[in-house]
């Protein structure tokens, strides 16, 4: 069994034979369901360099010894500024880390630390204990999402942004579901702040019977 806990915004904890964190933005996150010091991790996946996605990754990695997986440029930037942490830099494509299959895939978004552009944005398809999960990162919908289903499907769970303004809104995310054909979908990256206000029920209605939409509140867990 794999457990997926929504930590608020775009942050998730995935627990099976390994503990994985994705975009652990907790400090300063008004929707955060945990504190950085409460979390353990073997791997931390970062989708891009914006502060609401890198978040507390370095702090958690220093304390737990977790390996940080990120775009090559971001991985180098982090290790150069935080000696002692372990990073795995990628530039799209598949790899395997400690028994976890990871595919870093494109996302349509910018990636910077607020001053400098650092690498590209990405999403991840991960396979843990036979369960396939797609975290889209921050992105707009794009036609090549079809390839993720063709290459790595069936996807058991898709984690998709629906807040608009910086990412897909409900309409675009529903189209992404049509392209990805996942079994289950959890919306994310909405209602953290006013610019990304969105109604998850609208998204659920638009998806219809194309997938099972599960609306998680921060702190809630989905078992797969």
Swiss-Prot record:
Pfam families: Lactamase_B_3. The keyword Cell wall biogenesis/degradation does not apply. Gene3D superfamilies: Ribonuclease Z/Hydroxyacylglutathione hydrolase-like. Coiled coil: none annotated. GO terms for molecular function: hydrolase activity. Keywords: Hydrolase. Belongs to the UPF0173 family. This is UPF0173 metal-dependent hydrolase TON_1314. It comes from Thermococcus onnurineus (strain NA1).
